[in-house]
Amino acid sequence: MKFTTKSRYALNALIELHLMEIDGPVKVSKIADMQSIEITYLEQLFRKLRIAGLIDSTRGRNGGYFFAKDPCKISVKDIMIAVCLLYTS
């Protein structure tokens, strides 16, 4: 498999999510700022990752994204399939 911009951004964003999730759900804007990614682009990637069941989200003032399953059990292949192959729109 070849890394695409989508897969590279998604992988880096999930690493950032893992590092920040200790304090609770993480806002996509915070990850976008840390990774210098357009927020709208990252929101599209996170939507695909959520549909694939890799992450989940909660609404509200303290809302944000968090892992839906153990991050140690998520493979690079899972991420690439979620953002590059499945759920294209």
Regions found by a protein language model. Give the residues of each.
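N-terminal helix-turn-helix DNA-binding core of bacterial DNA-binding proteins
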Residues: 5, 9-11, 15-37
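Key DNA-contact positions within bacterial/archaeal DNA-binding proteins
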Residues: 40
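Residue cluster at the C-terminal edge of the helix-turn-helix DNA-binding motif
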Residues: 51-54, 82
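Beta-hairpin "wing" of winged helix-turn-helix
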Residues: 54-61, 66-67
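Charged, amphipathic alpha-helical coiled-coil/dimerization segments
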Residues: 64-81
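Conserved small/polar residues in nucleotide/adenosyl-binding loops
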Residues: 87-88
